[in-house]
């Protein structure tokens, strides 16, 4: 049994199965079946706490399970078509299912026990900054970091409430400065970190992926009087996220310009990398500006314009720069009222 730091937080892992795998039906409901067993044990009087006997007696409790779906599968769901699972080694058809039956099973199991999650393979790879070096097949345990196999990402998060001024507006200058300082610090950490395998270490230095994110979004929205589930809340969150990501890429390009040059993986991926930055810029224009302060919206657009121009001229030092981690542990050490991007939990 592995317990992180000797405490009750168990080591995490992500388990992913492609939606065309022959075992996908069993995989979809494996955790929900174990959840029902735990309920029965709790009803029989066993301890149902996180570290209690009930959940300690059932399987699959130390992993996050996700089904990897493609646009082809999602189209089959929408059009109510059949879906074939295929042999991994020969690609021969193994079984045929109604796509919507698989979809409903995924939804029911996720509703019952939280798993499986979904990873949208086609979308993930369409936003891949380094596709010429390999495709993205998987993620880290919490699914915020997706990149090449055998790679690693050091994470950092900012408490958004600390950047609100007396009128609950975002202090844009301070936020951008924090992004710049943190990206530089994370870039330095890449060379000082220890890696579990030689291959992970090599890729981390070739591509230098970083994971800057934020926490306390739910509290930020409450302080502004914005419902979490609202167009206004989503637009405001999108603008902040866009500003953070755009400024992080822009500063990564400044580091490449002023210090050490782009990462080694840049040369082979320059065109698709710049294409992803341009996609981000176009998405920024789609944020509903009616719900976002003008200066925040303009700052986000300017950061993306800067990242594209600097990237074209000098390259980018880091193949990825932002993630949105759940911050389930560090969020409370950071004086957050809510964790990650989540609302206040009842």
Where are these regions (language model features)?
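Active-site cavity-forming subdomains of large catalytic enzyme subunits
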Residues: 1-177, 191-203, 248-291, 297-299, ...
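Glycine-rich phosphate/pyrophosphate-binding loops
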Residues: 10-15, 223-232
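Gly/Pro-rich active-site capping loops and adjacent beta-alpha segments
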Residues: 165, 319, 330-333, 337-346
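Core structural elements
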Residues: 183-190, 203-225
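Short, surface-exposed loop/turn segments at secondary-structure junctions
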Residues: 197-204, 227-235
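Short secondary-structure subsegments characteristic of cysteine-rich extracellular domains
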Residues: 231-249
């Amino acid at each position: 049994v592995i317990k992180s730091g000797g405490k009750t937080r168990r080591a995490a892992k992500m388990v992913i199965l492609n939606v065309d795998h022959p075992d996908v039906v069993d995989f979809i409901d494996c955790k929900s079946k174990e959840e029902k067993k735990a309920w029965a044990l709790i009803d029989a009087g066993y301890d149902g706490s996180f570290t209690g006997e009930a959940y300690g007696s059932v399987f699959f409790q130390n992993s996050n399970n996700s089904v990897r779906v493609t646009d082809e599968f999602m189209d089959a769901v929408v059009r109510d078509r059949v879906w074939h699972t295929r042999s991994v080694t020969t690609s021969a058809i193994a079984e045929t299912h109604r796509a919507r039956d698989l979809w409903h099973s995924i939804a029911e199991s996720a509703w019952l026990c939280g798993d499986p999650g979904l990873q949208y393979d086609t979308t993930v790879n369409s936003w891949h900054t380094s596709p010429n070096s390999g495709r993205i097949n998987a993620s880290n345990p919490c699914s915020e970091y997706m990149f090449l196999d055998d790679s690693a990402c050091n994470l950092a998060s900012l408490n958004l409430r600390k950047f609100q001024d007396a009128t609950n507006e975002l202090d844009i200058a301070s936020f951008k400065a924090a992004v710049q300082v943190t990206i530089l610090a994370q870039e330095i950490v890449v060379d000082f970190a220890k890696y579990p395998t030689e291959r992970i270490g090599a890729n981390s230095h070739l591509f230098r992926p970083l994971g800057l994110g934020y926490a306390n979004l739910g509290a930020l929205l409450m302080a502004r009087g914005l419902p979490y589930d609202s167009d206004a809340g989503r637009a405001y969150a999108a603008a902040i996220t866009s500003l953070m990501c755009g400024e992080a890429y822009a500063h990564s390009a400044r580091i490449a310009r002023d210090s050490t040059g782009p990462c080694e993986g840049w040369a082979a991926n320059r065109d698709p990398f710049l294409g992803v930055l341009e996609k981000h810029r176009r998405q920024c224009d789609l944020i509903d500006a009616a719900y976002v302060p003008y200066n925040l919206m303009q700052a986000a657009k300017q950061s993306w314009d800067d990242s594209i121009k600097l990237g074209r001229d000098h390259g980018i030092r880091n193949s990825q720069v932002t993630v949105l981690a759940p911050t389930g542990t560090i969020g409370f050490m950071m004086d957050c009222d809510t964790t990650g991007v989540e609302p206040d939990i009842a």
